[in-house]
C-alpha cells in the first residue's frame, strides 16, 4: 500500500535519526523525497542510504536565507509540495545562568525562527490538499531543569501548528505537530556527555517513562507517514504526543 504515492515531500534534518527514518518510510510509501542537512559528510551518507532519486539540499536550519533557497530548489525540482516535515533542530541543555544571548539566539533560530520562515517560503508551493508537520516535544509540557530554551521553542511550534491551520486551512493546507518523548537517536550523542554520564542520564530518563524505554525513530516515522497521508485530512491544528506516557507523569 503506497499511502504517499507520487506526493512531493520535504524532510528537514533528514540525514539521521527521526528524519532519516522518515525519509525511508516516505520512499517505501511511494513519495518523492527531498531532505536537508548541514553536514556534507552526513548528507553524502544519506544519499548512499536513500538512493540517488532523493533530492539532497545542504542548508543551515537557522538561516532565513537558507530556508528561502530550499523553497527555490524545491520549486525547480518538484514544482509543488504535498507534505513537509519540519524536523531539523538542536537540543541545547544548560542551566539558566549559563545561557548567553548568542546561544539563546542560535537555539531559537534553529528550533523556531528557521522553521517559521521555511513554512512561509514554502506556502506558494503547497498543493491543495497539503500537510505541514512540525516537530514539537513532550518537554513543552514539562518543567524539566535545563530545558528552558528548547522547551520554549517547542511550545512555539505547538502554537504555530494551530495558527498556521487557522490561516491556511481555507486553501486546503493543514498543520499538525508531532511531539516525541525520549527517542533513541544520534541526537543523544551530541550532548557532550561522557559514557558514564550518558548511561546515568539514559537510566534517569527511562525512569520517567511509564513504557519503560526509549522510543525508536521508526515509531515516530510511522506517525509522520500518517500525518502526511490523505488519511489525516480531518486532523487540523492538533498535537500528537508519542512519548511512552511521559506526559501523564
Which residue stretches match the model-derived regions?
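Conserved glycine-rich cofactor-binding loop
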Residues: 8, 15-16
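Alpha-helical segment proximal to the catalytic Tyr-Lys
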Residues: 124-125, 166-170, 233
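Active-site helix of classical SDR
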Residues: 119, 153, 161
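Residue(s) in the substrate-gating loop at a strand-loop-helix junction
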Residues: 137
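Short C-terminal tail/terminal secondary-structure segment
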Residues: 142, 225, 232, 236-249
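The beta1-alpha1 cofactor-binding region of Rossmann-like NAD(H)/NADP(H)-dependent oxidoreductases
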Residues: 59-69, 101, 218-219
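Substrate-binding pocket helix/loop in short-chain dehydrogenase/reductase
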Residues: 95-96, 103-108, 205
Amino acid at each position: 500500500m503506497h499511502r504517499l504515492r507520487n506526493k512531493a515531500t520535504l524532510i528537514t534534518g533528514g540525514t539521521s535519526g527521526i528524519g532519516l527514518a522518515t525519509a525511508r518510510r516516505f520512499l517505501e510509501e511511494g513519495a518523492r523525497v527531498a531532505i536537508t542537512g548541514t553536514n556534507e559528510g552526513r548528507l553524502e551518507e544519506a544519499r548512499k542510504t536513500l538512493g540517488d532519486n532523493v533530492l539532497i539540499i545542504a542548508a543551515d536550519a537557522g538561516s532565513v536565507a537558507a530556508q528561502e533557497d530550499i523553497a527555490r530548489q524545491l520549486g525547480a525540482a518538484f514544482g509543488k509540495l504535498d507534505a513537509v516535515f519540519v524536523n531539523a533542530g538542536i537540543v541545547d541543555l544548560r542551566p539558566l545562568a549559563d545561557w548567553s544571548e548568542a546561544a539563546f539566539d542560535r537555539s531559537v533560530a534553529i528550533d523556531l525562527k528557521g522553521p517559521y520562515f521555511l513554512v512561509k517560503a514554502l506556502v506558494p508551493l503547497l498543493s491543495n490538499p497539503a500537510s505541514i508537520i512540525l516537530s514539537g516535544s513532550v518537554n513543552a509540557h514539562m518543567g524539566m531543569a535545563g530545558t528552558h530554551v528548547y522547551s520554549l521553542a517547542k511550545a512555539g511550534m505547538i502554537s504555530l501548528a494551530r495558527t498556521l491551520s487557522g490561516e491556511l486551512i481555507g486553501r486546503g493546507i493543514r498543520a499538525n505537530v508531532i511531539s516525541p518523548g525520549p527517542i533513541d537517536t544520534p541526537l543523544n550523542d551530541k550532548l557532550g556527555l561522557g559514557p558514564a554520564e550518558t548511561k546515568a542520564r539514559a537510566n534517569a530518563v527511562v525512569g520517567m517513562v511509564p513504557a519503560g524505554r526509549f522510543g525508536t525513530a521508526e515509531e515516530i516515522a510511522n506517525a509522520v507517514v500518517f500525518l502526511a497521508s490523505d488519511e489525516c485530512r480531518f486532523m487540523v491544528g492538533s498535537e500528537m504526543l508519542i512519548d511512552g506516557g511521559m506526559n501523564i507523569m
